[in-house]
Swiss-Prot record:
Classification via InterPro entries: F-box-like_dom_sf, F-box_dom, FBX38, LRR_dom_sf
Gene: FBXO38
Pfam families in the cross-refs: F-box
Region (Interaction with KLF7): 59-119
Compositionally biased residues, Basic and acidic residues: 621-630, 685-699, 787-798
Motif (Nuclear export signal 3): 451-460
Compositionally biased intervals (Basic residues): 889-900
Name of the protein in its database record: F-box only protein 38
Alphabetized GO MF terms: ubiquitin-like ligase-substrate adaptor activity
Species of the source: Homo sapiens (Human)
GO cellular component, one term: cytoplasm
Gene3D superfamilies: 1.20.1280.50, Ribonuclease Inhibitor
Oligomeric form and interacting partners: Part of the SCF (SKP1-CUL1-F-box) E3 ubiquitin-protein ligase complex SCF(FBXO38) composed of CUL1, SKP1, RBX1 and FBXO38. Interacts with KLF7. Interacts with PDCD1/PD-1.
Source organism superkingdom: Eukaryota
Length: 1188
């Protein structure tokens, strides 16, 4: 206090300061308050702030001393129980503090960050003995709240009368269980809530006061840890993944002790190997006295020996108050619900059912079962649930009031539509969550959703996976139950349950289980709520137990009688898992062949193409849409040139003298790009037989050797040797008789065929006069002599290059096949592969003068076009090479290309196949939102969803399109890491919706985005909204701008609505006349750009939102709130910092601008749309993000 008094005297003596200011500064209002008022104020302040006031003045020091003398409840963490107490305490200072509080009874927040185990002489520290000494200095102390294991054990030992307040939860839990985390619980410990995570505990004794016991990753070290277990006041018992005794008999005292807790409400046992049938017998003995009668939550997960009767007895006993049941996969069976159905019970409060429940730790942990057993956990081998559609029908007949349904990995569920019956209407179901039920049929699911009257939320995870590529081509169904493969992959062989169980435990679930026996449905099982009649239920459950045992025998017998063909299928090398309609499936690869992903190889080829053929001033053209399979063009005689069953292939160098006349070509539409006909297979066999005969009449260079090329898998008629649609042809079109020695391997053959083998053979076989290659569309001269190619199989010219042709003038010209959008079509356009010439209709599709013209190749006719599938959308950025540019480049040999095969095909075919179209049609009058994660759906259709509000799609690889027929109020769209999403189509669908709501669209694309084209389409389109496009470049992702935009986009719309409705402000329109009136930038809008940096990452916003710039630049008003963390430096616009809390307040701020726009007669839209694009995934690699 000395320095303060000294400074005051100095100020008084200073003649430059006015006297009235000195008087105001010296006046101390706090000292005018009484001690009683100050003590009353201290009740609302944290203890740390109270202690700081002690040094401000003498009166405040007296008030603090008086307050501490009478205080009875002290919180060292100011109510924040999750934080640590203030640092800086030592044993002496903590003792001094508590001595000032002689009447303290309850001490909360004793959470020291670190405590020494013992004192060290001469060293000031904060230690356990020092804390105990300070606590013992408080004579009236009743309870202490702490989270320190050693401290609470010391309190129990030296101060047993002190209660442990609140919830004891240790903060250093981990798995594997740290050996230093130890706690010995004494008998009769005074504690009500005990949460232990990652602790070594000898035993759980008798604790009469204990109400809530939560044990996770707890190692019970004594051989009989539950010998004295008795907690009669227990309400919650949770035991998850604990390392206890392996002998099931040692859990008998645990279950009997739980039965003695008459008020037990929550029972959760995960990986507890109690004795099978134990719960049944304990319930039989205790239900009359109230054992397990008050349960409202039952959770059984990975309990090795649990039987259906154990679960059934618990459910029946607790029927009156039961709210939630989570059932482990081994108990997820039809028989359980058939027996409960026959009990004829009512569950008036039941709401939540989780089938196939697997604990999160087992799902997220990468440890195998052997690793968990090594750390002391029970040895559990978990199989997927085997409940069928019959059991699901019984579910709702038993639990008629169910609201929340979650199903995990039940591979025997097929038709949800069959879950509905006269007695099973699912009338109260609000939320359905399906995970990895891979056999569920999409159309049946859509019909099921339509019949649910109260459904509001749908969550789909790893559902409706796309079938592997190539299955439709060879007639396989890949687990869908349709076609030839159903006999090979159906659920008939259960002789490898061990493998299935291990994979299921490691979050890799297979579909190798036997269907349950239907005899469970015939149990005559009746149950009433009267105590005297419940013996009938016990007898019925005994019968159910016998039937279940018989079922087990049947399954075992079927496993031993597995057909021989199923056992003969032995994988050579399990490489990795691929997601198909049957969940995650193993892909079997022969060890002698390296199989590469077709898409990745095509990307490599396109990169190689750019390195070889891109000139310095080469331009690039972007295709607008690549959606549907184009038309496949084949010649009439060459329709069987494709190969279906891997014929023998020999490579020749086709060369012919003179020129030949052209043969007309016809186009045939190809619905599926990989279908094989019997005619093609016969042609393959015939071509293979004819090759050796024709070889006899050919002149071969002496130095050349004829090699036979073996191919990987099968190829289709237009995909025989090419996967990329943008491919190189090197042809001698001049008609010279002899090739130059340096170009004999490259320029004398059509590169679309491997050495000119099959197509050359088929060409001469069909029509010797035709000189048009059926695939690359290059004219090749007919040859009287054929020479085998010098190049080996590995040196085969790549077929993914730009076409290079020797022109008549000797120069090397080039053309590349391009994807050209159909002009003027707003819907899905059919993309066509055409040549690069600037003549005909092809030239009309080119925009501007940025595209160089390519040369004509011997004639102006249209060349055959290969189909472009939606799966090829990543090859849309392809350059066009002009004649003059290629003339400057030096001739080079084609790059080496690896053999390609799509590793996601079941037959390892080197084919390009379109994604299997799967359309999810939603029609529900109460549906609010749908969330999809890792689903194989390609199209989402909102047919009739009047209450739908949001759509979330994350990591849906093949999701491409959205169609909105009737969903007027849907306003939030979230598409994150959807690899093949057609952004243009989705945005067009959303913006064409009637402007009844403001809408926000969040996109995280995984491909490059042409921002200029996107902005042009949105701002120039017929969309009656004010539009805002935000480009966010933070990596890792920052959600600050995304979250904050929702707080102010509605404010802009509210201002517009106020002006239009009450101020007679003109409303803007976006009709066809308006589009014709404003054909150029800014298309009748006031477009501006805002840029900035948030948390070190730049953002850019392009918008025509009115009023926003003025509101951002305005000064804060009297309503400004500074308790909000954001300002313009950390987000785009912070209205609360400005005090702009409502539309009325904002209109006062921008009144001048409103008058100007009224005079200019510029209208505004009532609704706004915000499009938020996050660019952290555009390189194709998904960024880890906790927010999705």
């Amino acid at each position: 206090m000395g320095p303060r008094k000294k400074s005051v005297k100095t100020c008084i003596m200073n003649n430059e300061i006015p006297e009235e200011m000195t008087a105001d500064e010296t006046k101390d209002y706090m000292n005018q308050l009484s001690h009683e008022v100050l003590c009353h104020i201290f009740r609302y302040l944290p203890l740390q702030d109270i202690m700081c006031m002690e040094c401000l003045s003498r009166k405040l020091k007296e008030a603090v001393t008086l307050y501490l003398r009478v205080v009875r409840v002290v919180d060292l963490c100011a109510g924040r129980w999750w934080e640590y107490m203030p640092s800086g305490f030592t044993d002496a200072s903590f003792l001094t503090l508590l001595k000032k509080m002689p009447d303290v009874e309850q001490l909360y927040g004793l959470h020291p960050r670190y405590l020494e185990r013992r004192r060290v002489r001469g060293h000031e520290a904060f230690s356990i003995p020092g804390v105990l000494e300070a606590l013992q200095a408080c004579p009236n102390l009743v309870g202490v709240e702490t989270s320190h294991l050693e401290l609470v054990e010391s309190i129990w030992t030296y101060m047993p009368h002190v209660h442990i307040l609140g919830k004891f939860r240790n903060r250093n839990g981990a798995f594997p269980i740290p050996p230093e985390n130890k706690l010995k619980i004494p008998i009769g410990a005074k504690i009500q809530t005990l949460h232990l995570v990652g602790v070594n505990v000898p035993e759980i004794p008798c604790i009469p006061m204990l109400r809530h016991l939560y044990m996770k990753w707890v190692r019970l070290t004594k051989p009989q840890p539950f010998k004295d277990f008795l907690c009669i006041s227990l309400r919650t018992f949770v035991m998850r993944n604990c390392a206890g005794p392996t002998n099931s008999l040692k859990y008998v005292p645990l279950v009997t002790g739980l039965a003695s807790a008459r008020n037990l409400e929550h029972l959760e046992m995960v990986r507890v190997p109690f004795l099978g049938g134990l719960i049944q017998h304990v319930v039989e003995d205790s239900w009359r006295s109230g054992g397990f009668r008050n349960l409202h939550t039952i959770v059984l997960g990975a309990c090795k020996n649990a039987l259906e009767v154990d679960l059934g007895y618990l459910i029946i006993t607790a029927a009156r108050r039961l709210h939630e049941v989570r059932i482990q996969p081994s108990l997820t069976k039809d028989g359980v619900f058939s027996a409960l159905k026959m009990a004829e019970l009512e569950f008036p409060q039941f709401e939540t059912l989780h089938l196939g429940y697997v604990d999160e730790f087992l799902l997220q942990s990468r440890m195998a079962n052997a690793d968990l057993v090594k750390y002391g956990l029970a040895d559990v081998v978990e199989n997927p649930g085997i409940i069928t559609d019959i059991g699901m029908k019984a579910v709702n007949e038993v639990f008629s009031c169910i609201k929340y349904l979650a199903i995990y990995n039940c591979p025997h569920l097929h038709n949800p539509y069959n879950w509905i019956s006269d007695h099973s209407r699912w009338t109260r179901l609000v939320d359905i969550n399906l995970v990895r039920c891979h056999a569920l049929k999409l159309d049946s699911f859509g019909q099921f959703i339509e019949l649910l009257p109260s459904l509001e939320f749908i969550s789909l995870d790893q559902m409706f996976r796309e079938p592997p590529k190539g299955c439709a081509r060879v007639g396989l169904s890949a687990g869908t139950g349709i076609g030839v493969s159903s006999a090979l992959v159906s659920n008939q062989n259960s002789n490898n349950d061990d493998n299935n169980a291990q994979n299921n435990n490691a979050n890799i679930h297979d579909n190798n289980h036997h269907h349950p026996d239907d005899s469970d449905e015939e149990n005559d099982f009746r149950q009433d709520l009267q105590p005297g009649e419940q013996q009938f239920a016990a007898d019925a459950l005994n019968e159910m137990e016998d039937i279940v045992q018989e079922d087990g025998e049947v399954v075992a017998e079927s496993g031993n009688n597995t057909p021989a063909h199923s056992q003969a299928i032995i994988p050579v090398d399990v490489d990795e898992e691929q997601a198909g309609p049957s969940g995650l499936q193993r892909v079997v690869k022969p060890t002698s062949i390296t199989v590469h992903d077709s898409e990745s190889d095509d990307e490599e080829d396109s990169l190689e193409l750019q390195e070889v053929w891109i000139p310095k001033n080469g331009t690039r053209r972007y295709s607008e849409r690549e959606e549907k399979t184009g038309e496949s063009v084949q010649s009439r005689e060459l329709s069987v040139s494709g190969k279906g069953k891997t014929p023998l292939r020999k490579r020749y160098n086709s060369h012919q003298m003179g020129q030949s006349k052209q043969f007309p070509l016809e186009e045939s539409s190809c619905e599926k790009g990989c279908q094989v006909t019997s005619e093609q297979i016969k042609a393959d066999m015939k071509a293979a037989r004819d090759i050796p005969e024709k070889k006899k009449n050919k002149d071969v260079y002496p130095s050349c050797s004829s090699t036979t090329a073996s191919t990987v898998g099968n190829s289709s008629s237009h995909n025989t040797a090419s996967q990329s649609p943008d491919f190189v042809r090197t042809v001698n079109s001049g008609g010279s008789s002899e090739p130059s020695p340096t170009e004999v391997d490259v320029s004398r053959q059509c590169a679309c065929s491997p050495g000119g083998s099959e197509d050359s053979e088929a060409m001469e076989e069909g029509d010797a006069e035709s000189s048009v290659c059926p695939r690359c569309c290059c004219h090749r001269p007919q040859e009287s002599q054929r020479r085998t190619s010098r190049c080996s199989d590995e040196e085969r010219p790549s077929t993914s290059r730009a076409c290079v042709v020797n022109g008549p003038d000797g120069t090397r010209s080039a053309f590349s096949f391009r994807t050209l959008p159909q002009g003027g079509s707003s819907g899905p356009a059919h993309d066509e592969r055409t040549n690069g010439s600037g003549s005909g209709a092809t030239g009309e599709d080119r925009r501007g003068s940025s595209q160089p013209e390519s040369c004509d190749v011997q004639s102006n006719e249209d060349y055959p076009r290969r189909p472009l599938t939606r799966a090829r959308s990543r090859l849309s950025h392809v350059l066009l090479v002009s004649e003059s540019e290629v003339a400057k480049t030096k001739p080079r040999h084609a790059m080496k290309r690896k053999r390609t095969a799509d590793k996601s095909t079941s037959t390892s075919d080197p084919v390009i196949e379109d994604d299997h179209v799967q359309v999810l049609v939603l029609k529900s009058k109460n549906l609010v939102g749908v969330t999809m994660t890792n689903c194989g759906i390609t199209d989402l259709v909102l047919k009739d969803c009047p209450k739908m509000m949001f759509i979330h799609a994350t990591r849906c690889r093949v999701l491409k399109h959205l169609k909105v027929e009737n969903a007027p109020i849907v306003n939030r769209f979230d598409y994150a890491q959807c690899k093949k999403l057609n952004m243009d189509q989705v945005l067009d669908q959303i913006l064409r919706m009637p402007p009844e709501r403001n809408r926000i669209i969040y996109l995280r694309p995984m491909q490059q985005v042409d921002t200029l084209t996107l902005e042009q389409k949105l701002f120039s389109g017929p969309y009656p909204y004010h539009i805002c496009i935000i480009h966010e470049f933070s990596n890792p992702p920052n959600v600050r701008n995304k979250v904050r935009i929702r707080s102010w986009m509605d404010t802009i719309a509210n201002i517009n609505q106020e002006l239009i409705k009450y101020e007679f402000f003109p409303e803007a329109t976006r009709s066809e006349e308006d589009l014709k009136k404003y054909p150029k930038y800014p298309w009748g809008r006031e477009i501006y750009t805002l840029e900035g940096v948030v948390d070190g990452a730049p953002y850019s916003m392009i918008s025509d939102f009115p009023w926003l710039r003025s509101l951002r630049a305005a000064e804060p008003n009297s309503f400004a709130r500074y308790d909000f963390e954001d300002d313009e430096e950390s987000t785009i616009y912070a209205p609360r910092r400005k005090g702009q809390l409502s539309a009325d307040i904002c209109m006062e701020t921008i009144g001048e601008e409103i008058s100007e726009m009224r005079q200019m007669k510029k209208g505004v839209f009532q609704r706004v749309v915000a499009i938020f694009i996050h660019y952290c995934d555009v390189n194709g690699e998904p960024v880890e993000d906790d927010y999705i």
